[in-house]
Swiss-Prot record:
GO CC aspect terms: cytosol; mitochondrial outer membrane; mitochondrion
Disordered: annotated segments: 158-189
GO biological process entries: protein targeting to mitochondrion
Function field: Plays a role in the import of cytosolically synthesized preproteins into mitochondria. Binds the mature portion of precursor proteins. Interacts with cellular components, and possesses weak ATPase activity. May be a chaperone-like protein that helps to keep newly synthesized precursors in an unfolded import compatible state.
Ranges of the TPR repeats in the UniProt entry: 9-42, 51-84, 85-118, 193-226, 227-260, 261-294
Reported phenotype of the disruption mutant: Mice are viable, grow normally and both males and females are fertile. There is no effect on spermatogenesis or protein import into mitochondria.
The name this protein goes by in its record: Mitochondrial import receptor subunit TOM34
InterPro entries the UniProt entry points to: CiliaryAsmbly_MitoImport (IPR051982), TPR-like_helical_dom_sf (IPR011990), TPR_rpt (IPR019734)
Sequence similarity: Belongs to the Tom34 family.
SMART domains reported in the protein's UniProt record: TPR
Length: 309
C-alpha cells in the first residue's frame, strides 16, 4: 500500500525513493508517475527534475524485468538532460538483458567518456566486449552504431555534481581489484587484456590520454597481472595531472614487478608534483640502484634537490 503523501513533487519523489529502497518497486513507480503528472501539469520547465523522475521510474521497471519500458523512460530522461550517467547505465543494463549488445556497448562507452572510472560501466564493457567478439567476430567494432562524443561541458557538469554515482566512483579502485584479482585470468582474458593494452598504447601515441585510460582500465578488468598496464595508465594520469592516481597505479605496478623502472620514475614524478620530495627521492634512489646511468632519473633527482633547497 502506497503511503499517503501530499501533492508535492518533492514529497512524492522522496516517498518513491523510500519504497524503492524497501524493494516495493511497483509502489515506487506509481509515486514517480504521480510526480511526473504533477510536474507536467504545472507547465513549469524543470528538465532536471523531470529527467530524474523518468530515470527513477526506469530503475523500477528494470528491477521488475520490464526492460522495454525501462529503455523508454531512460531515453526520455536523456532527452531532457543529455549524458546523465544513471539513465545511461540503466538503459545499458536493459539493452544487455535483451541481448542488444551493440546498443548496450554504446551506452556503457558513453558513460566512460563522462567518467572513465565508473566501475559498473567498466565491468559492463568487459562483459559486452566478450559477447560482441563471440557473436560478431574480430571485426565487431566496425558493426557498432555511432558512439556519441560527450562534450566537455557534460563532463564538467558530472564532475561537479555531489551525486550517489560519485560514491560508486570513489569505490572504483577496490571494485576493480575485486573484479580482477579474485580470479585467475583465462587464456582468453589474457589475450583480450593484451589487445586492449595495445589499443591504449596507440591512443597514447595519438595524445589521447583520457581514452587510453579507459582502454588500460578495461585491460586490467580482463587481467590484473600486467605491471606495464598499470605503469602505462600512470603515465596518462601524470599527463592529466591526476598525481594521486598515478601514485596508486605505480604502486600496483611495483607490487607485480619490483624492478619496473618506469613505475619508479613515474611515481617519483608524481611525488614531486605533490611536493612529497622525500618519497620522490626514495623512488629515484631505488631506480638508480637498478639503472645507475639512467639520465632522466639523474636529472629528476637534481630538480627535486633544487626544490628542497
Amino acid at each position: 500500500m502506497a503511503p499517503k503523501v501530499s501533492d508535492s513533487v518533492e514529497q512524492l519523489r522522496a516517498a518513491g525513493n523510500q519504497n524503492f529502497r524497501n524493494g516495493q518497486y511497483g509502489e515506487a513507480s506509481a509515486l514517480y508517475e504521480r510526480a511526473l503528472r504533477l510536474l507536467q501539469a504545472r507547465g513549469s520547465a524543470d528538465p532536471e527534475e523531470e529527467s530524474v523522475l523518468y530515470s527513477n521510474r526506469a530503475a523500477c521497471y528494470l528491477k521488475d524485468g520490464n526492460c522495454t519500458d525501462c529503455i523508454k523512460d531512460c531515453t526520455s530522461a536523456l532527452a531532457l538532460v543529455p549524458f546523465s550517467i544513471k539513465p545511461l547505465l540503466r538503459r545499458a543494463s536493459a539493452y544487455e538483458a535483451l541481448e542488444k549488445y551493440a546498443l548496450a556497448y554504446v551506452d556503457y562507452k558513453t558513460v566512460l567518456q563522462i567518467d572513465n572510472s565508473v566501475a559498473s560501466a567498466l565491468e559492463g564493457i568487459n562483459r559486452i566486449t566478450r559477447a560482441l567478439m563471440d557473436s560478431l567476430g574480430p571485426e565487431w567494432r566496425l558493426k557498432l552504431p555511432p558512439i556519441p562524443v560527450v562534450p566537455v561541458s557534460a563532463q564538467k557538469r558530472w564532475n561537479s555534481l555531489p551525486s550517489d554515482n560519485h560514491k560508486e566512483t570513489a569505490k572504483t579502485k577496490s571494485k576493480e581489484a575485486t573484479a580482477t584479482k579474485s580470479r585467475v585470468p583465462s587464456a582468453g582474458d589474457v589475450e583480450r587484456a593484451k589487445a586492449l593494452k595495445e589499443e591504449g598504447n596507440d591512443l597514447v601515441k595519438k595524445g589521447n590520454h583520457k581514452k587510453a585510460i579507459e582502454k588500460y582500465s578495461e585491460s586490467l578488468l580482463c587481467s590484473s597481472l600486467e605491471s606495464a598496464t598499470y605503469s602505462n595508465r600512470a603515465l596518462c594520469h601524470l599527463v592529466l595531472k591526476q598525481y594521486k592516481e598515478a601514485v596508486k597505479d605505480c604502486t600496483e605496478a611495483l607490487k607485480l614487478d619490483g624492478k619496473n623502472v618506469k613505475a619508479f620514475y613515474r611515481r617519483a614524478q608524481a611525488y614531486k608534483a605533490l611536493k612529497d620530495y622525500k618519497s620522490s627521492l626514495s623512488d629515484i634512489s631505488s631506480l638508480l640502484q637498478i639503472e645507475p646511468r639512467n639520465g632522466p632519473a639523474q636529472k629528476l633527482r637534481q630538480e627535486v634537490n633544487q626544490n628542497m633547497n
